[in-house]
Amino acid sequence: MNQIDRLLTIMQRLRDPENGCPWDKEQTFATIAPYTLEETYEVLDAIAREDFDDLRGELGDLLFQVVFYAQMAQEEGRFDSVSYTHLTLPT
């Protein structure tokens, strides 16, 4: 299992309707949006300070937010966990 698959599995467990974390299960796109904004500012701050050790951790936090949104979208049938990893790159 690679690290992304591991992260997806962790999020699935956190959001599991029967055994998941109560806080994670009650979150919605709207309720986690402020956390995403906060994590984005922390990424930008680490870049401004040129603190690449901190940046590594902050990017991990931001990636966790992306996985959180993807899990919720999957639960709602909007897309699956694979589809959001297929990036559309500019030509």
Predicted stretch roles:
Residues 4, 68, 79-81:
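Aromatic-residue hotspot detector
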Residues 53-57, 79-82:
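Short, solvent-exposed positions on alpha-helices
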Residues 85-91:
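Conserved small/polar residues in nucleotide/adenosyl-binding loops
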Residues 1-55:
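Extended low-complexity intrinsically disordered regions
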Residues 65-72:
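Alpha-helical scaffold segments in carbohydrate-active enzymes
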Residues 47-48, 72-79:
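Short alpha-helix-to-loop micro-motif enriched in aromatics/charged/Gly
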Residues 60-64:
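Glycine-centered tight-turn and secondary-structure capping sites
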